[in-house]
């Protein structure tokens, strides 16, 4: 018989309800209910996926071809880091470079010559040699020649003045001798006049009169005549008259002799005066030494100033030619205007000749820590409607790396007009991000990867509902 007590045991219920159906259906039901509840609260990111690349935020410099001549040196390398003024291209322009080198050499020589010419002018102004070292342009020799001319002029004038001095001394000596002779003759005339006065007026004659002997002789003759008259006894009137006549004749002859002697002396004095007058025109000293040296100095300075003017004109002409030649020469070489990363345009690589004005390369900013770059992608026009400035973009580098390289940026620009491609129209979208130091080894300009743009969020319930209802394409 059946024992009803068995219905009250747990073993019965365990055997009755512990089966496959109860063990599977209940968990699945609970899971389904939980999943449905999850769809109401959990959100799904709505994304737009595309292919993008890393681009610079700005172009530091654009480089164009400056010459159509054959290229003899080409340093254009894609992705190469270049320094400012690095040589990128060199065209066949050797003749122009040679001419520029010659012009620069001429300029250096002209400047060196100007320095030496300035030393010459200083030497002339200061009247001493200002050349510290040997002069290769002959200006020191010119100053030495100037000094030699000055010394020669000084010697000539000194010699001339010495001759004048000697001549003047000789003239003075002759004049003094003549004056002494005239004084002697005048004294003789005075002595004769003294005797003449003594004879005529009975005056006395000094004992130091050199002609006293003549006067004494005259008096002796007079005394003889008087003695002869006295010796005559009772001389008659005729005898007296004869004696008196002899005395008068003797006196007259003596006075006539004195007068003749005085006239002779006066004639000699007149002759000496004529000689003295002929000696009065003595030569004057040459006092033109200072003015002649000044004239010589002025001539030398004037010549050097003219040469300095010509030299400055030559330098100006050379500067103009050098400037023009540098303009020509700069077109025979292309240099990097600024430091950065070189991007060579694809059509340029390998070309031997490039037409003038053809763009050949661009220089991007150097990639370093904290450098900003653009994450650039092209979004089909069918997916662009949900994209806005300020949305996040995730860029994943498509390379075999131990760990995926992911960059996150913010959209800062969406083109207002689409770009046409074979596959259709697409809008250019740029997002800005900052490179960290750890990202630098794996980052290059032009590197491609997958871009994921988060344009919004939906609950999973709404997401699946839209899918079922055919609304939206996300």
From Swiss-Prot:
Keywords tagged on the record: Bacteriocin transport, Cell membrane, Membrane, Plasmid, Protein transport, Transmembrane, Transmembrane helix, Transport
GO annotation terms (biological process): bacteriocin transport; protein secretion
TM helices/strands, residue ranges: 22-44
Membrane topology, Extracellular segments: 45-474
Protein task: Involved in the secretion of lactococcin A.
Organism: Lactococcus lactis subsp. lactis
Upper classification of the organism: Bacteria, Bacillati, Bacillota, Bacilli, Lactobacillales
Pfam families, sorted: HlyD_3 (PF13437)
NCBIfam families per UniProt: bacteriocin_acc (TIGR01000)
Protein name: Lactococcin A secretion protein LcnD
Similarity-based family: Belongs to the membrane fusion protein (MFP) (TC 8.A.1) family.
Principal subcellular localisation of the protein: membrane
InterPro entries, alphabetized: MesE/LcnD (IPR005696), MFP (IPR050739), Secretion_HlyD_CS (IPR006144)
Gene that produces this protein: lcnD
Localization: Cell membrane
Topology of the protein relative to the lipid bilayer: Single-pass type II membrane protein
């Amino acid at each position: 018989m059946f024992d009803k007590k068995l219905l009250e045991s747990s073993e019965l219920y365990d055997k009755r309800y512990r089966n496959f159906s109860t063990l599977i259906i209940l968990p699945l039901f609970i899971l389904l209910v939980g999943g449905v509840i999850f769809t109401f609260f959990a959100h799904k990111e709505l994304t737009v996926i595309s292919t993008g690349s890393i681009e610079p935020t700005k172009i530091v410099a654009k480089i164009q071809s400056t010459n159509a001549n054959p290229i003899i040196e080409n340093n254009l390398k894609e992705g190469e880091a270049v320094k400012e003024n690095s040589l990128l291209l060199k065209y066949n322009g050797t003749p122009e470079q040679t001419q520029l080198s010659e012009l620069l050499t001429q300029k250096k020589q002209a400047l060196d010559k100007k320095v030496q010419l300035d030393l010459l002018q200083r030497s002339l102004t200061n009247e001493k040699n200002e050349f510290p070292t040997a002069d290769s342009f002959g200006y020191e020799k010119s100053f030495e020649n100037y000094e030699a001319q000055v010394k020669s002029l000084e010697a000539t004038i000194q010699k001339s003045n010495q001759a004048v001095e000697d001549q003047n001394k000789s003239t003075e000596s002759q004049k003094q001798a003549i004056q002494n002779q005239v004084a002697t003759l005048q004294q003789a005339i005075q002595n004769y006049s003294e005797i003449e006065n003594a004879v005529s007026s009975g005056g006395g004659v000094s004992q130091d009169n050199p002609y006293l002997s003549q006067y004494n002789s005259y008096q002796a003759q007079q005394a003889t005549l008087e003695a002869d008259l006295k010796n005559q006894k009772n001389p008659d009137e005729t005898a007296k008259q004869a004696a008196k006549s002899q005395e008068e004749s003797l006196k007259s002859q003596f006075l006539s002799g004195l007068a003749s002697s005085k006239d002779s002396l006066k004639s000699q004095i007149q002759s000496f005066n004529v000689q003295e007058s002929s000696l009065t025109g003595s030569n004057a000293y040459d006092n033109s030494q200072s003015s002649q040296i000044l004239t010589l100095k002025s001539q030398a300075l004037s010549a050097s100033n003219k040469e300095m003017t010509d030299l400055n004109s030559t330098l100006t002409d050379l500067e103009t030619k050098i400037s023009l030649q540098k303009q020509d020469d700069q077109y025979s070489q292309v240099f990097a205007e600024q430091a950065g990363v070189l991007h060579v345009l694809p059509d340029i690589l390998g070309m031997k000749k490039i037409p003038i004005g053809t763009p050949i390369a661009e220089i991007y900013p150097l990639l370093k820590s904290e450098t900003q770059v653009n994450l650039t992608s092209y979004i089909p026009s069918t997916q662009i409607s949900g994209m806005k400035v300020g949305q996040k973009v995730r860029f994943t580098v498509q390379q075999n790396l131990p760990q995926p390289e992911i960059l996150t940026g913010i959209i800062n620009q969406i083109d207002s007009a689409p770009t046409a491609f074979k596959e259709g129209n697409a809008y250019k979208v740029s997002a800005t991000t900052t490179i960290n130091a750890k990202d630098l080894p794996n980052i290059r300009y032009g590197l491609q990867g997958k871009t994921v743009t988060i344009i919004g969020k939906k609950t999973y319930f709404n997401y699946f509902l839209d899918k079922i209802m055919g609304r939206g394409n996300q």
